[in-house]
């Protein structure tokens, strides 16, 4: 009996560590870091890369974490209590606001669309999660995992590389992460799968090169026929 209790505690601790390591807040920053290390963007000036990484870090990790922490302390909520559906709105709104400011800052810096698209796709995912949260609950962790996999497919079309090994790695990570969220009883299987699907679809639609072409064509067609 004691062995089972120890095993259960170890499993829960492991699940908590996995959830903490693969937090949705870190995904945009890590995506930019990977782009600057493994793609042709590594040839860009170091100062430019540091500025972009600094902006992304401030608005997607530092500001959301800080504002949610302050909100939690003011209201006396524990991290576990914020998992409840009705208490998730304010953290979502705080994070969405921070991402909007990040997009505005990146626009002022004239950062290319395929970089701002990472933030835009994350923003779209969060807005959908807020809307769905009115009646149901999606896993933001799995939405982030789905967005990463969708981004890999989209960027493979843009940068012409074979994403198979990267896809294998991140699909495995997504499976482990989804299992961890279920073990912690933060989400059901349906919420995990729903979050993954939302992240995957949004990321593909926003980041795929074909989407950028369509976004450019529609204003031109509208201008021609007006």
Regions found by a protein language model. Give the residues of each.
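The first (N-terminal) embedded transmembrane alpha-helix
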Residues: 18-39
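Membrane-interface helix termini and inter-helical loops of multi-pass transporters
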Residues: 39-48, 77-80, 108-110, 211-224
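Loop-to-helix transition at the N-terminal end of transmembrane alpha-helices
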Residues: 45-61, 85-86
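Core segments of transmembrane alpha-helices
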Residues: 93-103, 144-149
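Transmembrane alpha-helical segments of multi-pass membrane transport proteins and ion-pumping complexes
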Residues: 24-29, 60-69, 96-104, 122-130, ...
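Membrane-embedded catalytic cores of phosphoryl/pyrophosphoryl-handling enzymes
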Residues: 112-226
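Short, Lys/Arg-rich, polar N-terminal cytosolic tail immediately upstream
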Residues: 1-15
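Juxtamembrane helix-capping/reentrant segments at transmembrane boundaries
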Residues: 18, 78-94
């Amino acid at each position: 009996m004691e062995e089972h209790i120890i095993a259960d505690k170890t499993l829960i601790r492991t699940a908590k560590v996995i959830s903490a390591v693969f937090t949705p807040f870190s995904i945009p920053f890590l995506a930019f870091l990977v782009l600057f290390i493994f793609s042709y963007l590594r040839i860009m000036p170091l100062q430019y890369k540091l500025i972009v990484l600094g902006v992304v870090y401030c608005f997607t990790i530092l500001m959301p974490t800080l504002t949610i922490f302050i909100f939690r302390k003011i209201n006396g909520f524990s991290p576990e209590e914020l998992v409840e559906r009705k208490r998730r709105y304010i953290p979502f709104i705080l994070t969405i606001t921070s991402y909007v400011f990040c997009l505005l800052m990146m626009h002022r810096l004239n950062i290319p669309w395929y970089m701002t698209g990472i933030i835009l796709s994350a923003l779209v995912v969060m807005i959908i999660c807020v809307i769905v949260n009115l009646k149901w609950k999606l896993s933001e962790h799995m939405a982030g995992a789905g967005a990463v996999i969708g981004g890999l497919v989209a960027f493979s079309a843009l940068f012409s590389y074979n994403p198979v090994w990267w896809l294998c790695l991140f699909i495995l990570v997504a499976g482990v992460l989804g299992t961890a969220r279920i073990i912690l009883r933060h989400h059901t299987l349906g919420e995990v799968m729903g979050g993954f699907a939302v992240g995957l679809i949004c990321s593909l639609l926003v980041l795929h090169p074909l989407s950028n072409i369509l976004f450019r064509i529609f204003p031109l067609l509208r201008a021609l026929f007006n």
